[in-house]
Each structure stands twice: as C-alpha cells, then as structure tokens.
C-alpha cells in the first residue's frame, strides 16, 4: 500500500513538471523554479525531480525528449524529425495570423522588452506556440535576457512588424487596454472588431 502511494505521488509530480515545462516552452524549467513550486528546501531537490521526470519522459518512444541546457530543462523535438519541423516552419511563415497571434504581437509592441511569462500573465493563457509563430514570421525577435530568476528571453518587435500591419509607428495601434485577451472569440467577432477606426485584424498584408 505504501509503495502504491509513493508511485501515485511520483506520477503526480511528473504530471506537474510536464505541465510546467509545457507552460515554460523554450524558456525551459530550472531546479530553482521546481523547488519554489513544490516548496522544497534545496535546489538539489528540484534537480532530482527534474532528472526523475527526464528519465521517465525519455523512456517513451515519442517525437520529443527532455534535454538539459546548462541548468535548464526543456522539451524539444528529437533530431530525426527536424526536417518535418522545418517544413512546418515554412508553411507557417506564409499563413495569416490568428487572433491570438495578433494579440501577442500587440502586447510585445507595447510592453517590449517583455518575457514570455509576462505575456502569459497579461493574456491569462499560455502563449508559447503563439510566440513561436511570431518568431517564425519574423514579426518579433529576441532582444536580450532578463536578469530575473531563470534568465528568461526578452522579446521585441522587428521592422517587419510595421510593414506587416501597414503602420508607420506604434501610435497607429489601438490602446493595449482595448485588446480582448480571450483566445476563444468567434471568427465573426474577429472580423467585426475594430479600434478607433483602425482594425488590426484586417490590417495584415497578404503574405
């Protein structure tokens, strides 16, 4: 019975770490962050949980594995699949932006330099995939590293951002407070929503 309880406890910890790692995206997860989440006393305890999770996760025959970069643990695509990922990148580059991507682009424009966790906090939902899409389309870029714990990447907009949305300055964008940070709005609402005469959703260039 005790062994069963211990197994359930480890399974739950693995689930939590997987969720945290997914939320962090390419920023990864550090032993210090795990220590804080689980209310542990030492970073070494957080590192052990991460190593246990990595052993569990990498034992499966999946398309992703946990890799360690210094002290940061990340879930990433395995090497044999990189060509398929590259094909998807080329497809995404020529697709128009979703409402979620437009929202994130607006947040980066107004709050730059900004970390992914700050974007998540503003929107109230994880934005990792959206940020990756904007990076692929070269609308945002990495502009530095934050000195905060975990040293997350800072993002800012690129010159292509202005061309993509047909604007000359950020003053032409709607106020940040007027964005609706809910990803589940219907397509009809996306097309109808405009701000002070400027419709950010219809301002995209045909790419």
UniProtKB/Swiss-Prot annotation:
The keyword Cell cycle is annotated on this UniProt entry: yes
Record carries keyword Cytoplasm: yes
A GO cellular component annotation in the UniProt record: cytoplasm
Any matching Pfam family: SMC_ScpB
Protein origin, superkingdom: Bacteria
InterPro entries: ScpB_csome_segregation, WH-like_DNA-bd_sf, WH_DNA-bd_sf
Localization of this protein: Cytoplasm
Keywords: Cell cycle, Cell division, Chromosome partition, Cytoplasm
SUPFAM superfamilies from the UniProt entry: Winged helix' DNA-binding domain (SSF46785)
GO BP: any one term: chromosome separation
Record note on quaternary structure: Homodimer. Homodimerization may be required to stabilize the binding of ScpA to the Smc head domains. Component of a cohesin-like complex composed of ScpA, ScpB and the Smc homodimer, in which ScpA and ScpB bind to the head domain of Smc. The presence of the three proteins is required for the association of the complex with DNA.
NCBIfam families, alphabetized: SMC-Scp complex subunit ScpB
Family to which the UniProt record says this protein belongs: Belongs to the ScpB family.
Function in brief: Participates in chromosomal partition during cell division. May act via the formation of a condensin-like complex containing Smc and ScpA that pull DNA away from mid-cell into both cell halves.
The protein, known as: Segregation and condensation protein B
Source species of the chain: Mycoplasmopsis pulmonis (strain UAB CTIP) (Mycoplasma pulmonis)
